[in-house]
Swiss-Prot record:
Coiled coil location: none
Lipidation sites (S-diacylglycerol cysteine): C17
Native species: Azorhizobium caulinodans (strain ATCC 43989 / DSM 5975 / JCM 20966 / LMG 6465 / NBRC 14845 / NCIMB 13405 / ORS 571)
Sample GO molecular function, one term: cytoskeletal motor activity
Pfam assignment, any one: FlgH
Recorded name of the encoding gene: flgH
Lipidation (N-palmitoyl cysteine): C17
Entry function: Assembles around the rod to form the L-ring and probably protects the motor/basal body from shearing forces during rotation.
This protein's UniProt keywords: Bacterial flagellum, Cell outer membrane, Lipoprotein, Membrane, Palmitate, Signal
Membrane topology listed for this record: Lipid-anchor
Lineage of producing organism: Bacteria, Pseudomonadati, Pseudomonadota, Alphaproteobacteria, Hyphomicrobiales
Name by which UniProt lists this protein: Flagellar L-ring protein
Protein family: Belongs to the FlgH family.
Assembly and binders: The basal body constitutes a major portion of the flagellar organelle and consists of four rings (L,P,S, and M) mounted on a central rod.
Amino acid sequence: MKPVILATASALLLAACQTNSYDSLAYGPTLTPVGQGLEAGRMPVPQPFQQAKERTFRSAYNLNSQSMYRALRAAAVGDVIRITIDIDDKAQLDNNTNRSRKSASDVGFASALNLSGFQSGSTSGSASGNLGLTGDTSTDGKGKIDRSEKLRLSLAAVVTEVMPNGNLVINGSQEILVNYEVRVLTLGGIVNPLDVTSNNTVAYDKVAEARISYAGRGRLNDVQQPAWGQRLFDAVNPM
């Protein structure tokens, strides 16, 4: 009976260690459904109902289309805007901390004691002592950061909300599957319509509350990540 219980417990433990589903292990990662990136991260402001404009009789111009006198810039919910990402950052930090502290204390005392009643007559005695305390603490710390980041991409995002002051809330995502590895690029933020160029493009550094994510998922990413048991052990290990 004990071998059966041991085998069952081992099987359950191995099943718990599995972080991916069978489909993911057999066929690799899958792409998210189209349109999932259009979901805004917060509740949008209700948009007023717009009555569709009717076409003028025997007119070659459709009033429902884009205006011939207006720049083709994103301005309404559902419009597409192009975001250019050109990051070339470099940071170097070098910190050094050294702290030392010493303390010493010396206390002496002397006292005369008179004892009587134990024997005939009286006896006298004396006591003396010396108490010394010393302490020494020191701290030495050093830290250095040297990092460089380069990222040059472009992404088409969709306007998911028009704020009361006219700013545009955008959200976009892009996924590419190559050799069972998915490259995922997501971007979200708030754009001022005045920063949109005539070709309907805005730079990433003009996007307020920008959230840019460039990551991946798949078999290669799973191998690079430590197992969840190791991460749990590192979280509770005090040493």
